[in-house]
Amino acid sequence: MDEYSFRIANRIVGNHKKAPGIEITLSGPKLLFHHDVVVAITGGKAEVDVNGNPVDQWAPIFIKAGDKLSIGKLSTGCRAYLAIRGGIDVTEYLGSRSTFALGNLGGYNGRVLKLGDVLFLGQPELPSCTLPSAVSEPTKIPESLIPSYDFNANKSWKVGVTCGPHGSPDFFKPESVDEFFSAKWKIHYNSNRFGVRLIGPKPQWARKDGGEAGLHPSNAHDYVYSLGAINFTGDEPVILTCDGPSLGGFVCEAVVAEAEMWKIGQVKPGDTIQFVPLSFEDAKSLKSKQDSLVESLQGELPSIETKALPKPENPVLGEVQVSPNAPKVVYRQAGDRYILVEYGENVLDLNLSYRIHKLIEMVKDNKTKGIVEMSQGVRSVLVEFDSEVTQKQLLQTLISYEKEIVFENKWKVPSRVIKLPMAFEDEKTLAAVKRYSETIRAEAPWLPNNVDFIASINGVDRSDVKNMMYTARFLVLGLGDVFLGAPCAVPLDPRHRLLGTKYNPSRTYTPNGTVGIGGNYMCIYTMESPGGYQLVGRTVPIWDKLSLGSHSVNPWLLSPFDQVEFYPASEAEVDECSERMNAGKFKVEIVDSVFDHGAYLKWVQEHSASIEEFQKNQGGEKLEEFNRLIQISNAELATNGGVKLGEDEKFSDDAELVYSEYSGRFWKPLVAVGDEVKQGQGLIVVEAMKTEMVVNATRGGKVVKIFHDNGDMVDAGDLVVVIE
């Protein structure tokens, strides 16, 4: 999350830049070493000692076998980093040694570290070791390289961003963009490696809805997100970070500059952020200077204060106008290392998917310099590039390729028909909806039942929604929605495209294998994760983590242009099939085929009368009514913190008022009113950033009052317990 601090930690101990280390959130571990090693601890300030003797951060620490290293609570910042000379020897998975805890992948058994875990260090002399050797001797660094982490609600972090990919006047009103940069955004307690949620002014939208993509103006046809994108999930902004989603259907107003992402890794609940608009050139310059600092260990961190643009930039870098043989193409700035290439108007058109397919093929065939990766969305492709090419050069190259693509209407691509079992509205699916209503938002148009909402807004019966799920064939247009190869797929029959909207705010939990509908699209969730689609049922896992299945050349099951069908199954059958799938024993029914767009257009034409009738009847007054409800019912329902003592609440003169040190959700009390407690004893648990933190008694006595109920919001400084 704070790449700068992690890189400096590796430099201090002399490690290769790819050596794995440990990221520590809010409170650190105690470690017993069995070998002589050199370590370094960077990031936020914490109490650090070896065998009870204090040691310095941001400097080499020489450890002997048998020594115990203790890292306490962070007093500034949110994260600290521990680098050990030689690195930590964990297996590489999909090109990384990082832990993706949400997906139970990578790192140490795919999870956070626990009491009793044994970590093995890199030993390059052993043939089995795949870690790179240390590259330099341990060294001290000048204080000028150590950032300040002393920020809070009254002293805002200044974070540099580039504008776009979505801006004004097409998505946000101009005054809303101005407010975005002038506002001080508070960090929400529910922030983590997935994303940093922000609390601030509601955006002023320049459009009433997302068209075919959904009923909320934040909805977009699914596209691939940039790392660091500030993503509006409904009216709620989230900064997408290391473990964030790959592809989704919400607009992004700005992207945090790559050199500024370390700050996002250090903000904690209750802190405030003010965004600073930067030019693309200044954002790249900041990254270049930061890399130079890490390599040379000389100089000081550059300031962004003098680099602020007088007004936000237009994120549109260029356009190719529509012609008889080609759609309109818009090239949008999507950070300082991405360009989002967007095709056509805001409608679903399979020709656009084929055009994206041809562009990706051209880049591969020409081995285009500087392009790192191309990631396909519904009507767009995200192009990641490196320092081998400038933004301007890449833009010119992409435009020149576009002119070479020949328009075709009768195209064919290889396709597989994949048939999966699905239990409609199983208990786990319904429990996820109920959990949302109990913990995030009690009332919304899609509550208490998502299927009822879909049926009502489309003027059909709930049985029609069920029949659609079992008779439709869904064409995969993008992957990674939200994670791990989850498909964004569209029903091929236009009569199966049901209007809807996504959750606002999004869910924090969706079961693995859940099937959702959002706007025109279907998604299968490939892990327990946040999400926004309306939930209708559950199928088998389609991410094969261990690649045990005969179908699994790669962990992901689906590819663009695959076609997915569901067949009815009971909840017990889906559970059994899921167990067999995870063990590599479930045989997925796969038929190799070809998607013939010419034949598809002919079929659509043959059924045009019934398709037009369906589209005419879809929505109407019901759609207008639901649109109205969504417009007036978009505020997240949450309990305010900041308990005030009422006039009738009198305590003795020697009463001890205990305040929370943390911002988060009141998780549970550890004591009850009337209990006798000792100084230092745990009183309550506050949950934030996937971490449980205990507020301890500041003195001994009797508990006479506990403020808040389970699930309430608590801010740092809020009164939580009274002891007499």
Model-predicted segments: where are they?
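Hydrophobic beta-strand core residues of beta-sandwich domains
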Residues: 55, 63, 113, 267, ...
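Short histidine-centered loop motifs in beta-beta connectors
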Residues: 260, 265, 551, 667-676, ...
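Short hydrophobic beta/alpha edge segments that flank linear recognition/processing sites
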Residues: 119-120, 270, 675-696, 715-724
